[in-house]
């Protein structure tokens, strides 16, 4: 290769990233208009489009580089010089951390995820100690209650860029002040003030005002979800001021926010104070930088691995028929490998399973489906793998494993947040905890269905319980759109003998689902059955599911809240708003 080509390649990659992030910001900047126009289908499409942008631009850069190099292979020394030139371009670059991830993605695409070493990639950042210079435009604005909290909140709301009319601004402010007074007390509230992010955070059918409530005893989250009535008037649905509530809003089972962030690292640092339980990876994920979140997640995994002497083991729970799942006992992630052969009742291919996981990545997860990160050629040290797990890997996924002596390479896997399997949780809890879990499970099914997702396999083992007690679906191999399912009532038996026969007395076609059958395996436990019948008996009726299908086909997009219904102002303090 001619000398000097290394710099051209480095510049081409960085220019490609500039183009990608420019389009990312362009799509994001349309969130306000989509919200104001209540164009919820455009909201969903924009979310998918933004996710696709990254891989699209990586592909464009790869094609450019193949043209520049005439498709010739490049030796290790050449690639090292490219990385050195790229690193020199980054010290004054405002989004250096994501630019490093983009470089990694281009390299992996060029070399088919092979030779992934710290020398060739930004496994760790080239600027780990970098601090932010003066930000041209502050991320947030401070508001002090010099003339009382009603006046402060009126200024905050009047400062918003939204151009729609408010249904009842004074009422909403009254509700917020009442909530803050109940939370902090009058004296503490008088000594507190707000810091509010300049940009709204858009997701689904809400625009979120995100701020910090700075009190004498510490800083709390201050989150206001802004919704629209059917008449297109704005109202504030609740006020959230605990770290647990904020953590759920920014949770790993929700779609990414659309928030205009030219300096994403600065926004992540600003958010960290009100989301102390979130890792750097989770914060980048929440604002839509999912590919860099993958980089940060891998770094967190490496740091954990370096500091522990644990071995990977099979994950607790009932062994899956499609996925082999393993974990490190002290690490909050699971690693999922598609098996070489599935159980006989699973009539599907590995390609189908991967397509299901991609569907979940792009769809509105409504807080009920765990996000995943996909890896290729994932290297594990054999010394970190328990003998039992190694035997299981070779038995169930040998076609995806390459033995390198002291290491193995797994050709493809997913990493996902670890949860307590719901079936195990239900065995361990009683009383109100059991009731809450069954209520959560039913709510998860309803919210998934409202978002046009049918889980397929609804067994408790396919759901997990988060640290906040939320029930989340995580087994996607049978997932499909609600509109693809034919929900049927079981026809009455023709003769008494029909009910005793080993085969059904009615025809069953692909795509047929009989909700009455759910009762057999959801209500078998005598502790659970009565609770389920009390709270979710309608899930056993085909007409319930068909009514949901009709709403989806009519173009209706349901409201899904990142908080309990009882937290809504309309429920806590007043009559229903509409």
From Swiss-Prot:
Q: Which GO terms describe its molecular function?
A: [isocitrate dehydrogenase (NADP+)] kinase activity; AMP binding; ATP binding; phosphoprotein phosphatase activity; protein serine/threonine kinase activity
Enzyme Commission code(s) on record: 2.7.11.5, 3.1.3.-
**Keywords of the record:** ATP-binding, Cytoplasm, Glyoxylate bypass, Hydrolase, Kinase, Nucleotide-binding, Protein phosphatase, Serine/threonine-protein kinase, Transferase, Tricarboxylic acid cycle
Chief location category: cytoplasm
What function does the entry list? Bifunctional enzyme which can phosphorylate or dephosphorylate isocitrate dehydrogenase (IDH) on a specific serine residue. This is a regulatory mechanism which enables bacteria to bypass the Krebs cycle via the glyoxylate shunt in response to the source of carbon. When bacteria are grown on glucose, IDH is fully active and unphosphorylated, but when grown on acetate or ethanol, the activity of IDH declines drastically concomitant with its phosphorylation.
- Cited PANTHER family: ISOCITRATE DEHYDROGENASE KINASE_PHOSPHATASE, PTHR39559
**Name recorded for this polypeptide:** Isocitrate dehydrogenase kinase/phosphatase
Organism lineage string: Bacteria, Pseudomonadati, Pseudomonadota, Gammaproteobacteria, Enterobacterales
